[in-house]
UniProtKB/Swiss-Prot annotation:
Pfam families: ASL_C2, Lyase_1. It catalyses: 2-(N(omega)-L-arginino)succinate = fumarate + L-arginine. One of its GO terms (cellular component) is cytosol. GO terms for biological process: arginine biosynthetic process via ornithine; L-arginine biosynthetic process. Disulfide bonds: none annotated. The gene is argH. This is Argininosuccinate lyase. It comes from Sodalis glossinidius (strain morsitans).
């Protein structure tokens, strides 16, 4: 049964009905719709629309419906109901008869769906926070296990300065911490209930909306009924945060894909997260990571799509807003899946420490140390930078590491260079000198790991 048939003399064309119906995706709001309906039935008691006996009948029937859905969710999609609100109402009428027709008194699908979606978003944020927490833990545990694995750090995909694999892991842990912070921040704005806003002008019944909000676990009710049903900021926020989070995971995936190449050879991925080739027997492809990288695009697309949907809408509900759900559901599902997959990839990763160290000693990654050495002896940094550049050119010409150039040759570039330069150019020294907060010095890495573990405990 449609919820709006009285105005029409002709039935909807089946092609339009298929185009218009949303049950195939908004069925995911079933639990939220039922929970919201229970709260609304209680509110109707306070204004005399329902007796307490009637309300209890409705609540019992709604709870039975919820249990039925949990047992056999496929029953929803077998229905020809227009949307989840229609489906729940019809289930109620089937169970309690005409009493079920009283539930929608004073309520619009406009405030109903806005409430359902906020309730769903809150639950999804909680699940995402859990997945982010688990991935952060995996990164910190991996960092702790590989504090001594030295590898090259890159800028412009060229070797730049030595770092450790632990430092790399902790960098992504920091990104995830920002993702977590953003999600926690949006919970504040999700904590306001639109239920009772009606179609756009508010409800004609003297319902205490703040009390109603409290029954649903919200901190308060919205202040303006027109904004309440027009607002999809929370959808845009979550899509934005998902887009940012997926960019982080895409960069994580790209780094590991590169580290896994034969050209880099820093890591070995587990067989559990790789696949082979149908033609080339030797192949072991990083499919899990490539899919994480690829799925980033679909999440960015969902954000762009929703922004374009909302940008020209007049206030109050428009059917365009039905398009808010599929992209949101898919984007947050994708983000959640990728968070879990990233943790699985880390779980089986193997570091090739000798190769990492070898690469860190190549590419003149200790050149900055020589510049700092000169600065410590009174040479202005810009001049020191130029001197070291000349020394690097000479080392390249000879095909040798910077630290193997004879002292006499180094002194030709600057007479202040002495024998004590060679320990400075050693790999261990390159790390040890970076002891300011956030640097790669061993004591800083150990402290960062300890602090991260404390935050995640």
């Amino acid at each position: 049964m449609a919820l709006w048939g009285g105005r029409f003399s002709q039935a909807a064309d089946q092609r339009f009905k298929s185009f218009n119906d949303s049950l195939r995706f908004d069925y995911r709001l079933t639990e939220q719709d039922i929970v919201g309906s229970v709260a609304w039935s209680r509110a109707l008691v306070t204004v005399g629309v329902l007796s307490e006996t009637e309300q209890q009948q409705l609540e019992d029937a709604l709870n039975v419906t919820l249990e039925e859905v949990r047992t056999a969710p496929e029953a929803i999609l077998a229905s020809d109901a227009e949307d989840i609100h229609s489906w729940v109402e019809q289930c109620l009428i089937d169970k309690v008869g005409d009493l079920g027709k009283k539930l929608h008194t004073g309520r619009s699908r406009n405030d109903q769906v806005a409430t359902d979606l906020k309730l769903w978003c809150r639950a999804q944020v909680t699940e995402l926070l859990g997945a982010i927490h688990l991935l952060q833990q995996a990164l910190v545990m991996t960092a702790e296990a590989h504090q001594d694995v030295v590898m090259p750090g890159y800028t412009h995909l060229q070797r730049a300065q030595p770092i450790t694999f632990a430092h790399w892991c902790l960098a992504y842990s920091e990104m995830l911490a920002r993702d977590e912070s953003r999600l926690r921040d949006t919970l504040t704005r999700l904590d306001v209930s639109p239920l009772g806003a009606g179609a756009l002008a508010g409800t004609a019944y003297a319902i205490d909306r703040d009390k109603l909000a409290g029954w649903l676990g919200f901190a308060s009710a919205t202040r303006n009924s027109l904004d309440s049903v027009s607002d999809r900021d929370h959808v845009l926020e979550l899509l934005s945060y998902a887009a940012i989070g997926m960019v982080h995971l895409s960069r994580f995936a790209e780094d590991l894909i590169f580290f896994n190449t034969g050209e880099a050879g820093f890591i070995e991925l587990s067989d559990r997260v790789t696949s082979g080739s149908s033609l080339m027997p030797q192949k072991k492809n990083p499919d899990a990571l490539e899919l994480i990288r690829g799925k980033c695009g679909r999440v960015q697309g969902a954000l762009t799509g929703m922004m374009m949907t909302l940008k020209g809408l007049p206030l109050a509900y428009n059917k365009d807003m039905q398009e808010d759900k599929e992209g949101l559901f898919d984007a947050l599902d994708t983000w959640l899946d990728c968070l879990h997959m990233a943790a699985l990839v880390l779980d089986g990763i193997q570091l090739k420490s000798p190769r990492c160290r070898e690469a860190a000693q190549q590419g003149y990654a200790n050149a900055t140390e020589l510049a700092d050495y000169l600065v410590a002896r009174g040479i202005p940094f810009r001049e020191a930078h130029h001197i070291v550049g000349e020394a690097v050119v000479e080392a390249i010409r000879q095909g040798v590491p910077l630290e193997t150039l004879p002292l006499a040759r180094l002194q030709a570039f600057s007479p202040v260079i002495d024998e004590d330069v060679y320990p400075v150019l050693a790999l261990a020294s390159c790390l040890a000198q970076r002891k300011a907060k956030g640097g790669v010095a061993p004591e800083q890495i150990a402290q960062a790991i300890a602090e991260a573990k404390q935050r995640l405990a």
